[in-house]
Amino acid sequence: MKHRTSVTAVYLLAALGLSGCAAKPPATELTQAQRIAKSAIIVDGHIDVPYRVNKHWVDVTQATADGDFDYPRAVQGGLNAPFMSIYVPASLDNSKASIQLANTLIDTVEAIVARAPDKFAIATTVADVRKQFTQGLISLPLGMENGSPIQGDLGNLQHFYNRGIRYITLAHSQSNHISDSSYDIRKRWQGLSPFGKTLINQMNNLGMLIDISHVSDQAFYQVIELSRAPVIASHSSIRFFTPGWERNMDQAMLKALGANGGVIMINFGSGFVSPQARQWWDRLVALREQWAVEFGQTSPETLALEAEYRQTNL
């Protein structure tokens, strides 16, 4: 039964709402996915709307011509709680401008809600999401991509928690003052920095999730060792499809994540599973089959799906 549910979930999140693609999922699976989507709460761990809207304003409370997320498409696809990514580029890692940008992007999400309180609501707890689901609202929880705005100050961590941030992706495309990045060959800290280890403890104390997407393998294992709470990979995929690419997680890491009680939201698009970005459906079928293999190695609760809308080519 759990395996059948996992296979349905692949179609549920991958097939729903993806229009204009060369290939289509079988009609029976699509119908089943649509039925489940209307009754279940669907969470997406990482959607890059705030940075997109801040860079080039568009009203996502209405249908939009570009991008991958707006209210009508979210409703059509059954998406209930997309985490709004408060993304800060690595170029701002050593600048207080990172704090300013993070606050501005949070303001952007709050403005979206203020513009359409009959459509969206900020969510800071699971209870918020469940209540808003019953009210017919799309919940907008907040996650910070790149911990640069913390700037080595736990007071900033508290500030952003108070503003609604409920997870932090420790690093992004470069190593920062918290953690080494999977993309950065320099590996400055050989995992987490001394401050990064302190930060893990305080995030646990606050009840803020630790996101290990983008971090190096060493940093991942150090987080698993230090964290007293389950951690997440908000938008990563499986290294089986991309041998040698540290951005994705290998089977040993998935086992460790499962033992921690955490979850990986598997990014199923573009170069995360295939160099040929437009062959997404064939690779998705392969991902479904590999998912079944991974179920034999880790807990079913460890695996989920994630689209990284706006940043990923499908």
Protein language model features and the residues they cover:
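Distinct, well-ordered alpha-helical segments
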Residues: 153-157, 219-229
